[in-house]
């Protein structure tokens, strides 16, 4: 019997409009796709620090148009001060 092939998620890097609060917390507000479509984030329902596979980023559970999705923030190399990180969503290939 054949075992099902496990599909690994593919990272899709996206532009995100976000705010920092007065305590340094990062809050995503909207996702902008490469084709220009903008999706406002209605709510952030959960946050998991260090959730990416290499523990270098965070996972936000967000709600867009009533649907729950995950949005990830991947921190970049600390040697480049002007680049804090980048955002991605996952798509199963």
Language-model segment annotations:
Residues 1-93:
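Cysteine-centric segments in proteins
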């Amino acid at each position: 019997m054949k075992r099902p092939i496990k599909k690994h998620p593919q990272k899709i890097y996206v532009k995100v409009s976000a705010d920092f609060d007065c305590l340094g917390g990062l809050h995503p507000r909207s996702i902008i796709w490469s084709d220009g479509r903008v999706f406002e984030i209605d709510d952030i329902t959960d946050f998991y620090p260090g959730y990416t596979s290499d523990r270098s980023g965070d996972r936000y559970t967000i709600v867009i148009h009533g649907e729950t999705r995950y949005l990830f923030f991947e921190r970049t190399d600390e040697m480049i001060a002007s680049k804090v990180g980048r955002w991605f969503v996952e798509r199963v290939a």
